[in-house]
């Protein structure tokens, strides 16, 4: 696995194409993705979660800087673990219910060398929102990402939008259960890249205390 690059470098910036091209690409994708949404129970009295901004309850204005993330994303990536590098498939669902937070669910599965399903991989669920910057409350709002990992730990990130289509976050706190995996903090960078895909890289602190490549992926929009 090569050293992580920023999504703009790894997959090409969406801004490298003309505005007309970007609009045309989005319109073409929407022919397939615009009619899709996540399954929900329709007999609950509260607003249903939606991963399609064309459907469901109105989007909360407090989250406009995170709006491009909403959708269902699917694709493949590369990881580095204690036993070497590996490939994985992944689905990320980013939905909302009109509240001042985004719902986040990421599921991954290991792939064989030929690209076939091998076994269950990492899974995490959590919430994105904006809060007062813990480092400087007088400054602009910070992104807060709270995640629970199936590997047995809870992680709190803070960060900021880098521009209208990329977001950077760093671990602020981490709590591990007795059965949980021993991990260090992380740095994540997400970005919407050329073609409208969602790309990200994650580095994690290793035993020597330095950030090392851990995960990277490029995911195509499936819903929204």
Swiss-Prot record:
What InterPro entries does this protein map onto?
Calycin, Nb(III)_bact/plant, Nitrobindin, THAP4-like_heme-bd
Q: Where are the transmembrane segments?
A: none
Q: Name one GO molecular function term.
A: metal ion binding
In which pathway does this enzyme or protein participate? Nitrogen metabolism
Q: Which SUPFAM superfamilies match?
A: Lipocalins
Q: Which reaction does it catalyse?
A: peroxynitrite = nitrate
UniProt-listed CDD domains: lipocalin_heme-bd-THAP4-like
Q: Which Gene3D superfamilies match?
A: 2.40.128.20
Cofactor (UniProt): heme b
Motif position, GXWXGXG: 71-77
Binding-site residues for heme b, renumbered to this chain = 187, 214
Record function comment: Heme-binding protein able to scavenge peroxynitrite and to protect free L-tyrosine against peroxynitrite-mediated nitration, by acting as a peroxynitrite isomerase that converts peroxynitrite to nitrate. Therefore, this protein likely plays a role in peroxynitrite sensing and in the detoxification of reactive nitrogen and oxygen species (RNS and ROS, respectively). Is able to bind nitric oxide (NO) in vitro, but may act as a sensor of peroxynitrite levels in vivo.
**Domain comment?**
Forms a 10-stranded antiparallel beta-barrel structure able to accommodate a hydrophobic ligand in its interior. In fact, this fold hosts the heme group, which is located in a wide surface cleft.
In which family does this protein belong, per the annotation?
Answer: Belongs to the nitrobindin family.
Q: What is this protein called?
A: Peroxynitrite isomerase
> Whose protein is this, by species?
Mycobacterium sp. (strain KMS)
Top-level taxonomy? Bacteria, Bacillati, Actinomycetota, Actinomycetes, Mycobacteriales
């Amino acid at each position: 696995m090569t050293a992580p690059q920023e999504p703009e470098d790894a997959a090409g910036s969406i801004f490298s194409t003309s505005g007309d091209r970007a609009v045309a690409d989005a319109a073409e994708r929407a022919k397939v993705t615009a009619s899709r949404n996540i399954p929900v129970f329709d007999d609950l009295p509260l607003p249903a979660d939606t991963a399609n901004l064309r459907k469901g309850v109105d989007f909360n204005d407090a989250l406009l800087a995170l709006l491009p993330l909403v959708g269902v994303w699917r694709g493949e990536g590369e990881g580095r673990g204690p036993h070497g590098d590996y490939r994985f498939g992944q689905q990320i669902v980013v939905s909302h219910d009109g509240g001042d937070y985004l719902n986040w669910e990421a599921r991954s599965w290991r792939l064989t060398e030929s690209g076939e399903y091998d076994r269950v991989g990492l899974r995490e669920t959590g919430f994105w929102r904006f809060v007062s910057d813990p480092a400087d409350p007088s400054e602009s709002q910070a992104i807060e990402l709270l995640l629970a990992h199936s590997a047995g730990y809870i992680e709190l990130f803070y960060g900021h939008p880098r521009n209208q289509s990329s977001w950077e976050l760093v671990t602020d706190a981490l709590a591990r259960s007795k059965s949980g995996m021993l991990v260090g903090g992380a740095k994540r960078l997400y970005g919407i890249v050329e073609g409208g895909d969602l790309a990200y890289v994650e580095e994690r602190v290793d035993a020597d205390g330095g950030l090392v490549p851990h995960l990277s992926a490029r995911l195509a929009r499936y819903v929204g």
